[in-house]
Amino acid sequence: MSLFVMADLHLSSDRSKSMDIFGARWQDHMKKIEKNWNAVVSPEDTVIVPGDISWSLRLEDSLEDFRFLDSLNGQKLIGKGNHDFWWSTHSKLRTFWETNGIKSINILYNNAYRFDDCIVCGTRGWFVEEAQQHTIGEVEYAKIVNREAIRLRLSLEEAKKLQDQDKNLPLVVFLHFPPVWNEFVCREILDVLHEFDVKSCYFGHIHGAYHIPRTQQFEGIDFTICAADYLNFTPLPVWSI
């Protein structure tokens, strides 16, 4: 069994929110996802999807997008992104999937899972700079950042419980937002990563930055971009430290 990651699928099965307007790389991106995903992911593998999964505004409207995701090879662990307005409680999401026969999707949000070579955990995170919030409206930056730091700590505390069973397994964090981007640093999130000695963190959210290195190090932590367009819509193998 292998572990992969790819964020920012931005699914729109009814094409009400086409991604084609964002450039040639996004043309027919759902077809690319289906082809490339199934080419590298086997049925026994797991793919982590850290947010921005469906453009739907309501959970009931997201069914076809989840059916598409469910049809792809492997198990999926999904996190929350800033565009996932359909997101609901864990119980409501699981009931919705169970009712509609969706069996390969589970939640990675304030919790943790153990795999053969690492323990994975994650949450959404938040914008690295207050000025970026224009994409979702007026919110209280400091309040939400602190809340997201608490959620990350909850997830890492669950991961630590699993790590107690095998001290050699590293903790790998999956966020939607990058804790570090260019000269901006989300110190609240970064401090939690240091507190739990995290050395590997994956993030999405950033689009069109195809020139940057896939992995960059900051304060001893490897930060790896896993946005779907950066990966050319091919899930990336997760390499633990």
Region spans (language model):
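Structural motif
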Residues: 3, 46, 118-119, 170-172, ...
